[in-house]
């Protein structure tokens, strides 16, 4: 596998409102634990769309991994000015992750017009990656459902790789990390 998309809940869908909240430490560690074996097996690219929450935390994780591994980060935003309506702290977070990216582009080269741009993003990213790592629990629907459904279709048609981190997996990492402190 050469490239993987990482996506999942937006931070506010998880009740997290700061990028460096305590919960973010556990989420980032979980993402790292799922990415690291893939990176060690030759994964070259992690693809995110730059949305708040799981994707930007994944960008932070990839930036950390770059110190020891030849992994690259691509940010493929669904449209121009995605962060224009975000608060200042979130805009800063997005720009910090963007600075760490090896590649950045807009899937539709215009500002937001309709939800179809999100569908175009999902299709483009799935069509141009070998798999996806999702922080998504089927028991708690949210914004990742659209990507998940499309990824499942790709899996059925072409063996698209899907690794879904649910809340039980996150809880295991929390417990594991708290035992080591």
From Swiss-Prot:
SUPFAM superfamilies: MCP/YpsA-like. This is UPF0398 protein Lm4b_01906. InterPro entries: YspA. It comes from Listeria monocytogenes serotype 4b (strain CLIP80459). Belongs to the UPF0398 family. It comes from the Bacteria.
